[in-house]
Amino acid sequence: MKYNSGRLLFAVDLAGTLLFGIEGATAAIAGHLDLLGLMVLAFSTALAGGIFRDLLIGDVPPSALRDWRYSAIAFTGGAIVFFLHRFVQGIPNSVIVVLDAAGLALFAVAGTEKALLYKMHPFVAILLGTITGVGGGTVRDILLAQVPVVLRADVYATAAMAGAAAMILGRRLGLSSTLAAVVGGMLCFGLRLVSVWQHWNLPTVSG
């Protein structure tokens, strides 16, 4: 995946891939999956969102399948968790939440940037940035037979959407693409963390 903004956003995409690979593998450990299951979750959590985005914008085969570095980094995240599983199991849940929020922010920004690169309407770019951020976690939860976090009363997709929107707004206000991406990513990251720590939830229907 190549960006007009240069190597920085490419590095952001790879960083998100590593973080979500680690997060997916950690979920596999918690779900008592074997090595194959761990690697499948690392791969799907890290790359599914980007694959969905690329299919929707017509970038086929998806970047994650064209460029070996994506798969390599996703599997590296899985390997880190596998070989350091005793250490990983001792990591507080708060650290996992921070890593997940960081991965969400990185992917929301990278997904929005690629959508803009493909001349998508800003509203569509926001949706594609959100899909990039939440797609992997959705597949992870489905594979673990759980209700996807994006469908729960939780500020998750909302945080990704807010970050993507802030990124586009920043560019409209004259910020450089890099600075706008930083602003959007920080908003997504901060909103996700605050929502978890303050127990913010979206409204639900009770009956």
PLM region descriptions:
Residues 1-122, 145-207:
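Alpha-helical transmembrane segments and their membrane-interface boundaries
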